[in-house]
From Swiss-Prot:
Complex formation: Probable component of the PAM complex, at least composed of SSC1 (mtHsp70), MGE1, TIM44, PAM16/TIM16, PAM17 and PAM18/TIM14. Interacts with SSQ1.
Main location group: mitochondrion
Role this protein plays: Essential component of the PAM complex, a complex required for the translocation of transit peptide-containing proteins from the inner membrane into the mitochondrial matrix in an ATP-dependent manner. Seems to control the nucleotide-dependent binding of mitochondrial HSP70 to substrate proteins. Binds ATP. Interacts with copper ions Cu(2+). Confers thermotolerance to long-term exposure at moderately high temperature (TMHT at 35 degrees Celsius).
Protein name per UniProt: GrpE protein homolog 2, mitochondrial
GO biological process: heat acclimation; protein folding; response to heat
Any GO MF annotation of the entry: copper ion binding
SUPFAM superfamilies, per database record: Coiled-coil domain of nucleotide exchange factor GrpE, Head domain of nucleotide exchange factor GrpE
PROSITE patterns from the UniProt entry: GRPE (PS01071)
Biased composition (Acidic residues): 130-140
Length: 327
């Protein structure tokens, strides 16, 4: 019974307070929008406050008369927090649903917020532009001149470096061409003169065949066939034919591989092609003429592999002309 009396008193006090607030609020000189808003807030607050007061009184009464409750103070605090959050969430909805606030006021609020955002963005962009302009203004004319001079100097250095590299490339290319030509020429010469040493070793064989052929011819010419009782003439003739055939075949092989024999009789002496072994006094020929050949010379293509061994005239027509000119 005591609990019911306390609860009835609390509800009566809350009703009186709400009626007083409703009576006193219109007396103030305010706009209808703000008065209605405040009235709704007060009404909501009174409705939220009454259950909270009742819950507090219930807990007080139960503690006064030693009654235990299943709810703890922590749960009461949680309830108060949740109720406060609900009231805070219901305030904007109540304000939006009030008849005093129309759509135009809402649009004005949103427009003002947008203008503030645009103003903030414009201020940020203007500040960045001013910073960039200040950075540009920091470079004076002298600094620009120095910067241009440095760039021109760097450009000239790069151009000189490019020029040197071009010259180096041209020199390298020319050297490479020379190396390629020299390599090609060496390869051709190696192939061309590969048989030089082998052919040079066969020159003595060719000389001996020539000497044998000349001796057999001389012996065969001196032989008297009428007094030849042993039959040596046919044998010498067969030997001569065999030697001559062998000599001819060897000469053909030499010619096939680029070797040629030359006999410089009655030619002017040439130290590149002739090797003077002795001198022959002969007034009928000009001085320095090849009068006698001991060994024939051989060439492999355009290269002399063995110069001819010759005898050169001495005291010929040139010496007589000198004597006449002196007289």
């Amino acid at each position: 019974m005591l609990v019911l009396r306390i609860l009835s008193r609390v509800t009566r006090n809350a009703g009186i307070r709400s009626s007083l607030s409703a009576v006193t609020l219109p007396a103030r000189n305010q706009t209808p929008v703000f008065s209605s808003r405040f009235h709704s807030l007060a009404h909501d607050f009174s409705h939220k406050l009454v259950p909270a007061q009742m819950s507090m009184m219930d807990s007080f009464a139960l503690q006064r008369f030693n009654f235990s409750s299943s709810t703890s103070p922590e749960s009461d605090e949680k309830k108060t927090h949740t109720e406060a959050s609900k009231t805070s969430e219901e305030k904007p909805t109540a304000e939006a649903n009030q008849p005093g606030l129309d759509s135009e006021s809402k649009d004005s609020v949103t427009d003002s917020a947008k203008r503030k955002r645009k103003g903030a963005k414009g201020a940020a962009s203007s500040s960045s532009e001013s910073d960039s302009e200040s950075d540009d203004d920091e470079l004076s004319a002298d600094d620009l001149v120095k910067l241009v001079a440095e760039k021109e100097e760097l450009l000239s250095e790069k151009e000189e470096e490019i020029k040197q590299l071009k010259d180096k490339v041209l020199r390298t290319y020319a050297e490479m061409e020379n190396v390629m030509d020299r390599t090609r020429r060496d390869a051709e010469n190696t192939k061309k003169y590969a048989v030089q040493n082998f052919a040079k070793s066969l020159l003595d064989v060719a000389d001996n065949l020539g000497r044998a052929s000349s001796v057999v011819k001389e012996s065969f010419s001196k032989l008297d066939t009428s007094e030849d009782s042993a039959g040596a003439a046919p044998l010498l003739k067969t030997l001569l034919e065999g030697v001559e055939m062998t000599e001819k075949q060897l000469a053909e092989v030499f010619k096939k591989f680029g070797m040629e024999k030359y006999d410089p009789i009655n030619e002017p002496f040439d130290p590149n092609r002739h090797n003077a072994v002795f001198q022959v006094p002969d007034a009928s020929k000009p001085e320095g003429t090849v009068a006698h050949v001991l060994k024939s010379g051989y060439t492999l293509y355009d290269r002399v592999i063995r110069p001819a061994e010759v005898g050169v005239t001495q005291g010929g027509e040139n010496q007589e002309e000198k004597k006449e000119s002196d007289a």
